[in-house]
């Protein structure tokens, strides 16, 4: 029996792998090959720039000592170190100083790189292996012979040998075959093993060569277990159990009692009292005396405690007013809440004005205008007529599509909602016309946006297209402004103005007048009511009855049909200059908020429900009741940087008999450029903010010394400014570079407390969120109660009137009651009640006013969320701001007094000097006159001496002595 053995052939991949490993281990790549394969240079070389001095010093001059045929030069390590010591950083080998010091041998290889393969003319070899590989490259014949030997060995290994017969060698397996007791038999196959013994390369003296290896060939050396998709998770289920629920998890609802017709009511009642006999019996009873005696001491203690400390103070609310102080940091970053931009109406346009809807939360209105200069506007006038401008109503529920569009006859620069009816909007156009809109028919669409469009039943049968509302009336071009209207404001519903500018009582309690200004040097007053009905002839009445009503294809409301194209102002206030001829050019104006007048009578019941402007008529002069507590002063900002303080009343000229405007009361020149913002503080009626191109100022009405605060000149020009409605000390400023500055006057009045970039274009308008009637259901049921009651029991037997004033959302009611029973109240209860109401109002205001609208010149509206540190005010912030303004006012008055005293003293000094100059210079006296005066003085002295001697009885004795001496 013969055993045959054969060698198992190897695969081709293994042979290739082995060959590649050997080649990589034996061959070191040349620098040229490494430069071609890698983007930089290999790690074992360093490119150098050698100056001519260094080349001569080391004997490696280019194209002389080293050439392209013989580029190698061996440098001694000690010479390089010596050069580094002498020249230090000037030495060309200073970048590789550490590599030279760490080099193990005494000579380093320097190679001349004539072709600038590595970017420089020389490169230094930093390793010994690389130096040997460059100086002694392997011969091509030896490499080929080695490859042939390796290939021959591989072929021999792969060749299958034929088995040959061999003699039998007994190993004991035949015993198992012939043994009968063996149950199992096994056949043992013996194979001959072949071993290959090779000596170690380090002992045999074989040269070892290493080479670089490409990082992309790692797959041939490793076994990768790559990820794959598990099919067990891709099995589709034929059936699946699911459930749906139709009701919403959360819903916001509110309810409010509808009170259509408020009335003034009075009620009087008297408590039940004891009779005189019963009172006498109770006062003389022992029980009453014992009770008073037992509680008298405790009552005195309670009264003392009540006077010493406020027992009704809430320590928890007074503990910490700002949450940021607990966390140790204050958040001042404005976060973008939403942004609005329409691809059609906002393209190549800018936002000129922004207003929050006063009664519908989440709705904001913007006016769009063309971004053109005057010359471009004239050239494209035909295109502008075919594409009218619009005012867009945006809602938070739909940031892509506007909810409503108001068509405008021209670009609108400013607009305002009527304070009486928020569906009436007045706007000022660029051509000088005043426009009126009525959106009463589309209020439901705007109110549906508050629910996020979830009311599907109201949307059935309605189109998704944005409705376009045409203007109801427009003023005549010949009777209006001759320049673009830059500002417009409504007069409050508490008063109106007659033709002389005098405030009179508004019996209709409806805002029917508005004020506009333009750079045409005038301020105009407009009235929405029709003029008084005049006596018409029978022919005119018959002709009017025969006229057919005009068709209304656009569905324009007939609210202001009586004003369309015939509307003209009833007061024209001019602004003559004080010191020279000419007039001021107004851009913005600010009126004092005269919303309350205590001389005004009760609200007229007949005019309370009248909302049809066409039925309202102007009052006659006899029916008008003048009001004395209404301020008629205006602050006007001009395009020349002047702040004008004037009165809108007109006076009759005695010479010409014409109605003329008086000259302004004061004029302040602030800047050389225009003032684009004049705004009153929502917390202080007499504090005004003015913003120019380079700085802003804060003024107090009636103070003529100057501004309370004037900021330093800014590097970037200001383009907008606005007061914060939640904190009295905070201002928001917009700049031309798209940044928004936040100023906190209590923190730092010289620089902004926070600056943040909002847009890449200039900021055009800034508006904080105003109070909305439907913001929160709790705000609709808010009432303010003021109780005036006797503070002591001393009025127990005297009927005391108790007045309850209820301030509701739409009206004010006064109820007067007469109480005849005893009221015992503490003064702290009244203060506590007032403080609680104030805190409640501040919290409601905080919930509403946490958004800031910022628009830019590219037509984008940014809605920013105001952080809590800029939204919540402390309980004493208003008092601190007021004290700050008072100190600034005292400072101005002090400096004004010093200046006046200095000028007065200067005038007195000049007068004295002038007086001395005008006095005549007396000529010098003659010698005779001097002698005569001296003799006269001597005679006066002798006379005085005689009188003194005579009084002392010395003169007689002297005379007698003289006579005795003279007698013989």
Swiss-Prot record:
Residues 1-33, 897-919 have a biased composition (Basic and acidic residues). Residues 1-39, 136-166, 897-930 are annotated as: Disordered. Disruption phenotype: Morpholino knockdown of the protein results in a ciliopathy like body curvature. Morphant embryos show a reduction and dis-organization of floor plate motile cilia and a significant reduction in primary cilia of the dorsal neural tube. No severe brain abnormalities is observed. WD repeats lie at residues 407-447, 480-536, 712-753. It is found in: Cytoplasm. Keywords: Coiled coil, Cytoplasm, Repeat, WD repeat. GO terms for cellular component: cytoplasm. Residues 830-857 form a coiled coil. GO terms for biological process: cilium movement. It comes from the Eukaryota. Residues 141-157 have a biased composition (Acidic residues). Its main location: cytoplasm. InterPro entries: Dynein_IC, WD40/YVTN_repeat-like_dom_sf, WD40_repeat_dom_sf, WD40_rpt. May be involved in the regulation of cilia function. Part of the multisubunit axonemal dynein complex formed at least of two heavy chains and a number of intermediate and light chains. This is Dynein axonemal intermediate chain 3.
